[in-house]
Amino acid sequence: MLSRKWIAAAALVAGTSSVAHAGYIDTTFTSGMTTQVAGATTYDFDSGVKPDGYGGAGAVLTDSVSGMAAAPAGDSTAFLSVAYPSSSGTETFLAAPGQQYNYFGLYWGSIDDYNWIKFYDGSTLLGTVTGTDVIQAGAQLGDQMAPGSNRYVNFALNDMSFNKIEFGTSNFAFESDNHAMAAVPEPGVLALVFAAFGALFLMRRRRTADLTF
């Protein structure tokens, strides 16, 4: 299991009173196509329609579409493709009123540098992660079969919680499956998540995220 950490610096949101916490998002990578966090709520898209809370320029597909969408490697079930059938756009997950999460995981397929995920608490942007941030070192962007560009990615938000996620792409396409969310009690979110993974912590790399407000 590999880990990367992004820092979310406190910043005033222009035109509002919202302030992003001085917290961080820790990103880990685990084997398989599903979360290893016990008790997480999982959305697998197998019903063929988007679950409650999802909306925007995304579609649930049951197979690859040449030149437009590719099923994540090894995934023979339905998956979410953003922004099919368009080349660019965003899909948004909005939590139920009063619900906050600090863990999110997904099986991210054929990771591209023009894919991104943004975490929000209301209108406050907590952090942005792009495909470049999560692809395995040395892997080819957009590879539809290689494990380094098709991987289960876990995000643990420390000293922050989210109620909205934006999935975006500026070209064909952002494919994913088995979204998972959980509210892990703080403090010690990261330690609890690592315990759930049951894997050794191998490497940590810290970098500062460029946030746009």
Regions found by a protein language model. Give the residues of each.
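Bacterial N-terminal signal peptides that target proteins for export
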Residues: 1-7
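Bacterial N-terminal signal peptides
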Residues: 9-16
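Hydrophobic alpha-helical membrane context
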Residues: 16-17, 198
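Sec/Tat signal peptide C-region and signal peptidase I cleavage site
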Residues: 18-22
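Surface-exposed, well-ordered secondary-structure segments
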Residues: 23-183
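A short, hydrophobic C-terminal helix/tail in secreted or cell-surface proteins
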Residues: 186-204
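C-terminal membrane-anchoring or membrane-association module
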Residues: 201-213
